[in-house]
Amino acid sequence: MAAQNQSAQKDLEIQVKAPDGKVDGSVVLPAELFDVPANIALMHQVVTAQRAAARQGTHSTKTRGDVSGGGRKPYRQKGTGRARQGSTRTPQFTGGGVVHGPKPRDYSQRTPKKMIAAALRGALSDRARNGRIHAVTELVAGQTPSTKSAKTFLATITDRKQVLVVIGRDDQTGVKSVRNLPGVHILSPDQLNTYDVLRADDVVFSVEALNAYIAANTSEEVSA
C-alpha cells in the first residue's frame, strides 16, 4: 500500500507571477512536500499542541485559604436551625474562595519533530491539490513599499479572505507592503506551520521563500 501511495505522487508545476500581473516562468513543487496524503488526525494533534503551547497559563483563582477574612465562625454551631458553618469564606458564600478553580500551569505538549513536519506536508499538499498554492517573484516592484500595489497584486491572485504570505526575512519591502492588509498573515519559510497553513484560504510564496523551504526539507531547489 505504501508503495502504491508513493507511485501515485507526482510533482506539481505552478506559474510564477510578477507584480505587473504577467507570468514569469514556473516552479515545480516536489511531490514529497506538496503531494502527500493528508493525515487529518495527525494535523489535528499538531495544531492542538501548537495552540496549547501558545496559552499563557497565568490564570489563577483564590481558594478559601487564599481569601482574606472568614476566621471567625459566622454563628453558633447549634440552635439556629441553619446549616452549620465554620467560615464565611467557603465556596458557598458570596466573597468566598473558588473550589477547583484554575491555577497557573504549563499547557505545552511535547510533539516529535517528525510529526510536526509530516503534518505541515499534509497541510501544504491539501492546499496544492486544490490550487491554493501560488508563487510570485516579489510582492511589489522595486524597493519602495506600497500597500496599495501589494493589495492590487494579491487581488489578481486570489479573492479569498485569508491569505498566508511566505517571504524571506530580508524582504522588508514586502513585509511593509502587506503587514497592514486585513486577512493577510506573513511568515518566513522557517516559521511555516500547520496551523497557519490550514487557517489560510491561499498560501502565496515568493520564489526566494519557496526555494528556502524546499532546500531546508529536500535536496532540491526551484528556479523561476
Curated annotation (Swiss-Prot):
Protein name, UniProt field: Large ribosomal subunit protein uL4
Lineage: Bacteria, Bacillati, Actinomycetota, Actinomycetes, Mycobacteriales
PANTHER family (UniProt xref): 50S RIBOSOMAL PROTEIN L4 (PTHR10746), LARGE RIBOSOMAL SUBUNIT PROTEIN UL4M (PTHR10746:SF6)
Gene Ontology MF term list: rRNA binding; structural constituent of ribosome
Native source organism of the sequence: Mycobacterium ulcerans (strain Agy99)
Free-text function comment from the UniProt entry: One of the primary rRNA binding proteins, this protein initially binds near the 5'-end of the 23S rRNA. It is important during the early stages of 50S assembly. It makes multiple contacts with different domains of the 23S rRNA in the assembled 50S subunit and ribosome. Forms part of the polypeptide exit tunnel.
A Gene Ontology cellular-component term: ribosome
BP term (GO), one: translation
Sequence similarity: Belongs to the universal ribosomal protein uL4 family.
Region (Disordered): 52-109
Organism domain of life: Bacteria
Subunit structure, interactors included: Part of the 50S ribosomal subunit.
Pfam family, one: Ribosomal_L4
UniProtKB keywords: Ribonucleoprotein, Ribosomal protein, RNA-binding, rRNA-binding
Keyword Ribonucleoprotein (UniProt): yes
